[in-house]
Amino acid sequence: MERTPALYPKKRLPARLFWPAAALAALAGGGALAYYWRVFYSLDARGWPAPLLFGAAGALALLLVGGAWLIRRLRGLPARAAGCILLAGALFCFADPPMQAPDEYNHYLRSYSISQGRFDFDAQRTYPPDVCRLYRAFPGAWVSAHTSQGLAKDEGGNEIAYNSEGYALKQRGADGPVESVWDSFREYAAGGGAEAVGEPILFMVLPFLPQALGMLLARLLGFGALGCLYGGRLANLCLYAFLCYKALCNCQRGRGVLLAFTLLPLSLYMAASLSYDAHLLGCYYLCASFLGKEEFTRRDGAWFAGAFLLMNVAKPYINLLWLLLLFFLPGAPGRRVKRGGFGLLLGLGALAVTFFVSWYGVALRSNYGEIGRMLGEDVQQLPQLFFVLKNPLRYAAVFLGTLYENGFFLGQLGLFGALDLPVEVLNLASPLMLALAAALTCRKEKTLRRAPCAGALTFGLLYIAGAATAMYITYTPVGMVRIIGLQARYFLPAFLMLFWLLQKGLGRALRPAAGPERGEGLCLAFSGLFAAAGAVLLFQHYFVGPVYLIR
């Protein structure tokens, strides 16, 4: 096989020269970024000291190079990937303002209660003053909560309508102050009283134990409500990194695509939040990794069972679909037949766990009164399920139309916050990055293993249909012709399967120039850089710019 010079350079820069050169390049890049921010977003006029800005950019650049040097010294791709996840995930942890991940405000309150040793649910119980102050200063969906709309005048004096939707920063008048998330930090730091906050309508414990442990450690170290939030985020990130490490250790075929998904900005954004989606995504990637194994062993079955039961505690019913993979995992045909009994036991166990969690949430609940439906009586689950079964063609039209109008959600992988902060560059680049990972790590195979490929395709399509149907019967009034509430993160397991199949197809159609190890190394480097860039862009959109100008 011929080797292209681009992938196999004849001479490599010695390590004693490479890392100093990398540090200088990173400093130059950080300085260029700071200069761009300073000029394009008028940071001098907004009171940002130039020395502080350039100093922070340089320090961050050196920190990233130092982290890359440490990661390079780790042995094996899974360990290096876990290091990249921790490094880039930490950037997301601090780039994302408090309470901005989907439902993070409720997850924060429940996790804080658990960190105090409270495993029951009492609506009359309130939180400490600093927690209430943080909760009031940072409303969930901050961008939507601070969106302005109305009438203004253009340069010619004509009235025009304006809407600051999708902008985290806005400015009233060319010389007016810029309103941003910094105002919420100042409000929280100013102290003062805040209205009491009661426990949320959220009745689970197990999915919040990791972040509750992080909050407990932060509180023992003397941190307040804000420090507890970051402590919980970092604890979630560590668990996600461990699950991804285990998944990459399992996966021997198609590992490059799995690697790219673990480092996808949207994955890291959720992993570095207080949402239970952090370990939910880790469990998804762990279960999916068994498709890439040469042989599915009993120990693998134990890991699969643990991840499967945990994901069904957090999100029941839809995750029963993961049992389908048991019939397509590698192994002798006789073993696949035996897995039917194993799958039946897991399914019964998942249902038992679901009913126990539901009973626990009711039995230990007090002072909540009657809890109404989120969308009132317009949404009735069983009648809507029967409606879908009686009108399959109508639902198929609603399903396909919703996917089409949203670009099959592949163009929303850069949508952050509570679906209120789009980063268009990441919306465009994320699917391209996944396709690049598939191309870099494809390898020539004489024959495709039909069972894993059939399992990936079947699971991917059924998961998309199942996730959409679940949102239709639980959140969408039956008369609507569009399914509401769908998000790109719901489809990440299905996207993983489809890009894994793309990698297999490219391996059959192309002649890969790089060997498996070289391709995976390049994939790790590109995915890690893309993840770090995603965190920087998230910080920019929340704190620096673009700024919506209201004249």
Predicted regions and their residues:
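Interfacial juxtamembrane loops and adjacent helix segments
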Residues: 118-229
